[in-house]
Amino acid sequence: MKKKLFPILCFFLVLCCMLPQAGAATFNIDFETYSAAIELVNLDTDTIVYEKNATARREPASTTKIMTFIVVSEQIQDLDNTQVTVTKEVVDQLLGTGSSLSGIKENDVLTVMQLLNCMMVPSGNDAALVLADYIGNGDSNAFVELMNEKAQELGCQDTHFTNPHGLHDDEHYTTAHDLYLITKYAMSLPHFTDICDQTRYTYTPVGGPEAGQQRTLVTTNRLIDPNLDPDLYYRYARGIKTGSHDQAGYCLVSTATRGGY
């Protein structure tokens, strides 16, 4: 089995990584890192390759959606055939927030699988909120409670979510190490890694005014798409999730395999 490096490039400047605290001194690096919090793990052995402020609280921005994916996947049995209607009341909640959006529209009828792709590939806050509203039976706060319950179940020690998308809130935080625990679990779920490694996602709404009309979405992850930024593209990287806003800075969770490691 090839050994996988698990760089969670999180919390400020891009091109750093994260992982668990125990044994963090196992490896030394000969370059300076600039991210505020980092954890890098070998997934085959759970060996810590490097860590920096891995237990410090940080806002995770859209890497929050990894937990949103987990909760949705565990609450909905049939992702491909469960359909959700997008309502004006839900999407209007994001007006004026500067959100990243997938472009879903009022009265679209989409499958949960389509919404998960819309959430993870272009980092659509709109898709995240629609899913949370649907599973929470009109109350996204009920969905957020499920997110926090799952974080505790996974052993997260310093994580608290207040929304399903990652917009700024002083009480919305996690750590590099907790985000590692969350992502490692997400990678065990069906569809997660395949969805997160896409550079493009094309779909057609199953119902609504634009039913059958094709739409194509583009990843926000510059590590995996050479067309976005050749200088940041890293051909050994796979997925997973970007995030950014003024308070969080630039966040990234990713994996990479090179030379058998």
Segments (PLM) and residue ranges:
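Intrinsically disordered, low-complexity sequence elements enriched in Ser/Thr/Gly/Pro
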Residues: 1-2, 56
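Hydrophobic alpha-helical segments, especially transmembrane helices
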Residues: 3-5, 66, 242, 258
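Penicillin-recognizing serine hydrolase domain
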Residues: 31-36, 136-261
